[in-house]
Amino acid sequence: MSASLQLQQLQRPGYTIDLYIPNAQEVQNIYFQQKQVQAQVPFPHWTKLWPAALAMGDFLHEHPELLKDKKVLELAAGLGLPSFVAARYANTVCCSDYLEEAIAAMRKTVLHSQLNNVTCELLDWNHLPSALTTDILLLSDINYDPEQFDQLYLVLQRFIQQGTLIILTTPQRLMAKPFIEKLLPLCKQQYEMTADNTSISLLVLQK
């Protein structure tokens, strides 16, 4: 069972963007139904547009020079907002997630917006193809599960060693502080931003 997708036009500072987003009430209803059957079922976080994704989109809009003629990959893209902003300036964009439902939603946005330079792929950062490369890696609000921090750090190291520029946004969660501190030696630039009344840190990482 899946929530219906609704086309929304987001009004952001200096730009607008169309995005297919699952109906929030239907998402809640389906989640509570599933929870009655399986108490440990996780909430589908991909169905919501998070402040870190908004901040990433705003940053990319303000810094198109980072994306010009580049190959861009977003991991755990969810609804894909940063990818779709990047597509306005980049050569090619791959927006990926490990959930089929998220991929279906992003593909609907791609078709609606006729984004010929965007592909949507099913990718799990625990099992990335060995040949996968990119010029720029986008990661927004991916450091929310401490159990994933070690694997996530290995993924970041892999792309850093390839010469990839990584742009990462994260809300300032206390539990994520050790993970972010571990990345600071790789940090070339750091910005403090606000989106939806939430403080967001943006890190630009490169070897």
Each model region followed by its residue ranges:
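S-adenosylmethionine-dependent methyltransferases
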Residues: 1-207
